[in-house]
Design a protein with these regions (language model features):
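Single conserved hydrophobic/aromatic residue that forms the stacking wall/gate
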Residues: 1-16
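Serine residues within intrinsically disordered or low-complexity segments
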Residues: 19-20, 29, 33
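N-terminal cysteine/histidine-rich coordination modules
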Residues: 34-122, 126-136, 140-179
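Conserved aromatic-histidine-acidic binding/catalytic patches
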Residues: 66, 127-131, 149, 186-189, ...
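Charged, amphipathic alpha-helical linkers/stalks
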Residues: 163-247
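Hydrophobic, aromatic-lined core segments that form the binding pocket/scaffold
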Residues: 212-440
C-alpha cells in the first residue's frame, strides 16, 4: 500500500540537548479514567460558533473527490425515498446510490468523482427536494467534529473546508478552552495532566516571536523526554515547559545544522507516498499532478550527483536560493498556519483512550501533515514563478493545497498507525527524523 519504506536518519541531537532538560518520572493515561461529570460539558474553541457553510459559493466543494459516509439510519430512510427527477441517472431509491467501500457505506461518486446529488449550481438536489433532514450525518455535521471523553465533550472544526480556512485567516490567534482547569475540580489528576500537556503545547505554539518550525522541534523533543521518563505529573510539566527550560532547549536546537536540501528531498518522498493511492483513483489530479511531476524532477536531479557533479551542484545552489525565497514569501501566512497547527493539536493530539505513546504518534502525523502541506506550497510556488513570473504566494493557492492535503491526510487512528508502521522502520520516530522533515 505504501511502497517506499524509508530508513530513518540518525542525528546526535539527544546527547546535545539532554543537559537542558531535567529528568523526572511521569504518567498519564485517559483509558483508565472512570470519572464522569454529572453533566456533560461541551467545550469549544472561540471560532466554532462563527462557522457558516457557504454552499454554492464554496470554491472546493465537499461533495467531490472523497468518501461521503451514509449512516445506517439514513440508509434505511433512503430505501423509502425516490431520487429527485433532476438526478441524471434514476435508480429505484436513494439507497441504490450508495456503495460499500473500505468497510463503510458511502455515496457512489460519478465518473467525475462528484456526488450524483450535486447539481450544476453546486447545491444538493436532495436538500432542494426534501430539505436538510434527508441528509446523512456526515453531510449534516461536516466540517464539524466532536470528541467524546468520559468527562466532557469537545467540538471543533476540520481544516478540509475552505470556509474554515477563511475563518482562521481572519483571526490573529485562536483560543481554546483550558480543559485541565475543568477536570482538576473533579480530582481526576491522571486525566487532567494529559489535557494540561496539550495546553502547554498549544501555548508553546502560540509564541509568534519564534518560528513554527522551532516550536514544533521543541514540542516533539519534550514529548519524547516525557514519554521516556514516566510517570507524568503536573510538577514535571511545569518544569519541562518553564521559560528557562524552553529557552535552553531552543538554543541547543538552533545550533544544529539541518540541511534544507535533505528536507526537500525527504519531503518530496513524503508527498509522493501520500499521493500514491489518490493518483491510482484519479483523485485531485488538477491539484496534485503538476506538483508531483516537479517533485519527481527534483528527486531525479538531486540523485544525479555521480554522473554530472557540476550540474548537480549548480542545481542544488539554485534550489537552495528558491527555498530561501519561498520561506520569505510564506512568512505572511504564518499566523494562519499557526492557527491551523494549533487546531490540529487541540483536535487530534489527545483522543479518547489516549496515552503518551498515542500522543507521540499523533504529533508525528501532525508533523508529517504540515511538512507535506508546506512542501506542496513550495512546489506550486516554483511552478507559478516559472509559468507567470509570480513571486508571491496567493491566498487562494495556499487555501486550495491546505484543504486538499488535509483531506488526503485525514486518516482514522488505526490507518495512521498502519501507514507509519508500513512506511518507517519504527512506529516511533527518532527526534532526528522529525527534525529532518520540519527543518529550522
Amino acid at each position: 500500500l505504501h511502497p517506499r519504506v524509508r530508513r530513518q536518519r540518525q542525528m546526535c541531537i539527544r546527547d546535545r540537548v539532554r543537559s537542558s532538560v531535567r529528568h523526572t518520572n511521569m504518567l498519564g493515561s485517559i483509558q483508565n479514567s472512570m470519572t464522569v461529570m454529572t453533566e456533560i460539558n461541551y467545550l469549544i474553541p472561540d471560532y466554532y460558533s462563527k462557522f457558516t457553510c457557504i454552499a454554492d459559493r464554496c470554491p472546493i466543494t465537499c461533495c467531490q473527490e472523497w468518501k461521503i459516509g451514509v449512516d445506517a439510519d439514513t440508509n434505511r430512510k433512503w430505501k423509502k425515498l425516490q431520487a429527485p427527477e433532476t438526478v441524471p441517472e434514476q435508480k429505484k431509491n436513494l439507497s441504490a446510490y450508495t456503495i460499500k467501500k473500505d468497510g463503510q457505506r458511502v455515496i457512489g461518486l460519478d465518473s467525475d468523482h462528484r456526488c450524483p446529488f450535486l447539481n450544476s449550481e453546486k447545491l444538493c438536489r436532495l436538500v432542494v427536494a426534501y430539505g436538510d433532514k434527508v441528509l446523512s450525518e456526515t453531510c449534516t455535521t461536516f466540517p464539524r467534529e466532536e470528541h467524546r471523553f468520559p468527562t466532557h465533550n469537545e467540538k471543533m472544526l476540520m481544516p478540509c473546508c475552505p470556509a474554515v480556512i477563511d475563518l482562521w485567516n481572519k483571526q490573529k490567534s485562536l483560543h481554546f478552552p483550558n480543559v485541565s482547569d475543568t477536570l482538576s475540580d473533579t480530582g481526576d489528576t491522571d486525566t487532567s495532566v494529559l489535557f494540561l500537556l496539550r495546553e502547554k503545547l498549544l501555548n508553546l505554539l502560540d509564541d509568534s516571536s519564534r518560528t513554527i518550525e522551532e516550536e514544533l522541534l521543541e514540542s516533539f523533543y519534550i514529548l519524547q523526554e516525557l514519554y521516556q521518563h514516566q510517570p507524568l505529573t503536573k510538577e514535571l510539566l511545569e518544569d519541562y515547559f518553564s521559560d528557562n527550560t524552553v529557552r535552553e532547549l531552543g538554543n541547543a536546537i538552533s545550533d544544529i545544522d539541518l540541511p534544507p536540501l535533505d528536507l526537500i528531498s525527504e519531503c518530496n518522498e513524503l508527498l509522493q507516498d501520500l499521493s500514491v493511492n489518490y493518483q491510482k483513483e484519479g483523485l485531485y489530479q488538477d491539484t496534485l499532478n503538476p506538483i508531483l511531476a516537479l517533485a519527481e524532477e527534483i528527486s531525479e536531479a538531486l540523485s544525479d550527483s555521480t554522473e554530472n557533479p557540476d550540474d548537480t551542484k549548480s542545481y542544488e545552489s539554485t534550489l537552495l536560493e528558491q527555498w530561501e525565497q519561498f520561506t520569505q514569501y510564506l512568512s505572511p501566512y504564518e499566523p494562519l498556519l499557526r492557527n491551523f497547527l494549533r487546531n490540529e493539536i487541540f483536535s487530534d493530539l489527545l483522543l479518547p483512550d489516549s496515552d503518551l505513546e498515542n500522543v507521540l504518534v499523533q504529533m508525528q502525523w501532525i508533523a508529517l501533515e504540515y511538512a507535506s502541506i508546506r512542501h506542496s506550497f513550495f512546489l506550486r510556488w516554483m511552478l507559478d514563478g516559472t509559468d507567470a513570473n509570480v513571486s508571491e504566494i496567493s491566498y487562494e493557492t495556499l487555501r486550495q493545497y491546505l484543504v486538499i492535503l488535509t483531506r488526503m491526510t485525514g486518516y482514522e487512528t488505526a490507518d495512521i498507525y498502519e501507514y507509519l508502521e508500513n512506511s518507517f522502520e519504527s512506529l516511533l520516530w527518532d527526534w532526528g527524523y522529525f527534525a529532518l522533515i520540519i527543518g529550522n
